[in-house]
C-alpha cells in the first residue's frame, strides 16, 4: 500500500517475544522482567494480523524478538506464514545461539533468510557485550545456515567505540573467506543504547572508507545498507546508519510488537494497539490502512525535545 508520502509499505517486522537468552549492553538490562503472558499476542492473533496485512499489500515478513527462537511456536508461525501466497519473503533476526539445532526445521517450515547478530569475533569481547560466553554456538549457527543454503546469511554487527570498533578489518576479512553479508550497524540511542550512545557511537563510514580495497556495489531497492565487496571475496560488506544518515524517504516497513501494537516508525513513541480489532477483520484492515497511509515521513531521534520511543529495543523488535 502507498502511504501519503508515496512510499510502498510492503514489509512487516513482527516481534514474537520480548525474551532473550543474552543481555547485550545496548539492548537488555541484566535484571529485567518480561511482559506477562496474558498481555502478549498469541500465535492465532499473529495470523489474524497477517491476513489483514497481506490484504493491504504486505508481502515481506521478518520475525524478531527479543530472541524469536525462544518462542516455542516459531516453526508453526513460519509454516502458517508460508501458506499465505501473497508473502514472498520470510526471514528472522536472531542471535544465532539456537540455530544449530533449529535451523533445519525452520527451513522446512518455510524460512527463507536469516540475519544473525554477532558484534565481535573474539570470545572475551562477546562475553563483555552479551554477558554470556556463547560465541561458539553463534559461529556454529552461521555455518549451519550456510550449509542449509539459507542465503544470503547476513551478520548484523553493532559497532561500539572502545569495545569492538577495532574489529572492522576482521569482519571485512571474514567476508573475503565466507559467503556472508556483513552489515555494520550504527549504535542507536534507544533504551540501554542511550546510556552508552555518546561515548560509544562510531563513524562507520569513515572507518570503512579508510580501506582502499572496497568496491561499491548496487544495493537492492529499499535496502537500508550501503554495500561493498572485496575483489575475489566470497561475501559482501555494508553499513547501516539510521541516525547519522537516515533513510526515511525509502522506508517500506512497519513493526508489530509482541504486545500487539503497531509502530509505524522504530524511533517514534507512536504506537497503535490493534488487539481491540482482532476479532473484526474488516475493521482491522481499515485500521491498518489508516496507520500505513499516515506513516510519518521521517524520524527526529537526533533532535532535542521530540517524542522518542520510551521502550527498550528488545520490547520493540527493532
From Swiss-Prot:
Binding site for [4Fe-4S] cluster 1: 20, 24, 27
Binding site for [4Fe-4S] cluster 2: 248, 251, 265
InterPro entries from the UniProt entry: Aldolase_TIM (IPR013785), Elp3/MiaA/NifB-like_rSAM (IPR006638), MoaA (IPR013483), MoaA_NifB_PqqE_Fe-S-bd_CS (IPR000385), MoaA_twitch (IPR010505), MoCo_biosynth_MoaA/MoaC (IPR050105), rSAM (IPR007197)
Binding site for S-adenosyl-L-methionine: 26, 66, 117, 188
Gene Ontology biological process terms in this record: Mo-molybdopterin cofactor biosynthetic process
Top-level division of the source organism's lineage: Bacteria
Signal peptide: none
Annotated cofactor note: Binds 2 [4Fe-4S] clusters. Binds 1 [4Fe-4S] cluster coordinated with 3 cysteines and an exchangeable S-adenosyl-L-methionine and 1 [4Fe-4S] cluster coordinated with 3 cysteines and the GTP-derived substrate.
Pathway: Cofactor biosynthesis; molybdopterin biosynthesis
Enzyme Commission number(s): 4.1.99.22
Domain Radical SAM core: 4-218
Cofactor(s) needed for function: [4Fe-4S] cluster
SUPFAM superfamilies: Radical SAM enzymes
Catalytic function, reaction form: GTP + AH2 + S-adenosyl-L-methionine = (8S)-3',8-cyclo-7,8-dihydroguanosine 5'-triphosphate + 5'-deoxyadenosine + L-methionine + A + H(+)
Positions with a binding annotation for GTP: 13, 62, 93, 154, 253-255
GO MF annotations, alphabetized: 4 iron, 4 sulfur cluster binding; cyclic pyranopterin monophosphate synthase activity; GTP 3',8'-cyclase activity; GTP binding; metal ion binding; S-adenosyl-L-methionine binding
Gene3D superfamilies registered for this protein in UniProt: Aldolase class I
Entry annotated with the keyword Iron: yes
Family classification: Belongs to the radical SAM superfamily. MoaA family.
Binding partners and assembly: Monomer and homodimer.
Entry function: Catalyzes the cyclization of GTP to (8S)-3',8-cyclo-7,8-dihydroguanosine 5'-triphosphate.
Protein name: GTP 3',8-cyclase
Source organism: Clostridium acetobutylicum (strain ATCC 824 / DSM 792 / JCM 1419 / IAM 19013 / LMG 5710 / NBRC 13948 / NRRL B-527 / VKM B-1787 / 2291 / W)
Amino acid at each position: 500500500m502507498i502511504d501519503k508520502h508515496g512510499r510502498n509499505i510492503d514489509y512487516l517486522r513482527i516481534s514474537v517475544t520480548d525474551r532473550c537468552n543474552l543481555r547485550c549492553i545496548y539492548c537488555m538490562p541484566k535484571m529485567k522482567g518480561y511482559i506477562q503472558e496474558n498481555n502478549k499476542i498469541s500465535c492465532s492473533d499473529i495470523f489474524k494480523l497477517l491476513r489483514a496485512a497481506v490484504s493491504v499489500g504486505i508481502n515481506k515478513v521478518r520475525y524478531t524478538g527479543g530472541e524469536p527462537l525462544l518462542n516455542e511456536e516459531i516453526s508453526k508461525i513460519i509454516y502458517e506464514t508460508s501458506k499465505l501466497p501473497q508473502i514472498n519473503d520470510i526471514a528472522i533476526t536472531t542471535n544465532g545461539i539456537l540455530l544449530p539445532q533449529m535451523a533445519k526445521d525452520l527451513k522446512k517450515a518455510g524460512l527463507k533468510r536469516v540475519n544473525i547478530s554477532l558484534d565481535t569475533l573474539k570470545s572475551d569481547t562477546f562475553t563483555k557485550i552479551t554477558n554470556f560466553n556463547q560465541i561458539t554456538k553463534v559461529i556454529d549457527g552461521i555455518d549451519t545456515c550456510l550449509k542449509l543454503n539459507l542465503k544470503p546469511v547476513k551478520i548484523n554487527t553493532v559497532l561500539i567505540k572502545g569495545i569492538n570498533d577495532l574489529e572492522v578489518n576482521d569482519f571485512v576479512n571474514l567476508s573475503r573467506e565466507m559467503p556472508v553479508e556483513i552489515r555494520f550497524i550504527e549504535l542507536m540511542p534507544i533504551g540501554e543504547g542511550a546510556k552508552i550512545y555518546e561515548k560509544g557511537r562510531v563513524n562507520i563510514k569513515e572507518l570503512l572508507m579508510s580501506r582502499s580495497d572496497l568496491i561499491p556495489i548496487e544495493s537492492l531497492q529499499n535496502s537500508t545498507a550501503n554495500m561493498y565487496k572485496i575483489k575475489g571475496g566470497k561475501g559482501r560488506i555494508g553499513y547501516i546508519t539510521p541516525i547519522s544518515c537516515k533513510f526515511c524517504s525509502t522506508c517500506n516497513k512497519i513493526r508489530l510488537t509482541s504486545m500487539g501494537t503497531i509502530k509505524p516508525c522504530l524511533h517514534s513513541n507512536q504506537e497503535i494497539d490493534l488487539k481491540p480489532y482482532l476479532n473484526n477483520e474488516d475493521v482491522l484492515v481499515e485500521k491498518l490502512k489508516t496507520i500505513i497511509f499516515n506513516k510519518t515521513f521521517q524520524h527526529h531521534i537526533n533532535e532535542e525535545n521530540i517524542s522518542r520511543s520510551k521502550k527498550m529495543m528488545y520490547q520493540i523488535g527493532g
